[in-house]
Curated annotation (Swiss-Prot):
Belongs to the eukaryotic ribosomal protein eS30 family. This ribosomal protein is synthesized as a C-terminal extension protein (CEP) of a ubiquitin-like protein. The gene is fau. GO terms for cellular component: cytosolic small ribosomal subunit. This is Small ribosomal subunit protein eS30. GO terms for molecular function: structural constituent of ribosome. The keyword Ribonucleoprotein applies. The lineage of its organism: Eukaryota, Metazoa, Chordata, Craniata, Vertebrata. InterPro entries: Ribosomal_eS30. Pfam families: Ribosomal_S30. It comes from Oryzias latipes (Japanese rice fish).
Length: 59
């Protein structure tokens, strides 16, 4: 019923090298977050023809 013996449990995680977590800048919350959201969605939009671009589009 089990795939492989329990001796192999955690093999992949054990052999992956440890990478230190890097500092990320703190995200805004509350009013400031809404402000960024508003600017992203309505203020600096580039008018495009045809299909609407998604929120995660890079082009």
């Amino acid at each position: 019923k089990v795939h492989g013996s329990l001796a192999r449990a955690g093999k992949v995680r054990g052999q992956t090298p440890n990478v230190d977590k890097h500092e990320e800048k703190e995200e805004e919350d509350g009013r400031a977050k809404r402000r960024i959201q508003y600017n992203r969605r309505f203020v600096n939009v580039v008018p495009t023809f045809g299909k609407k671009k998604g929120a995660n589009a890079n082009s």
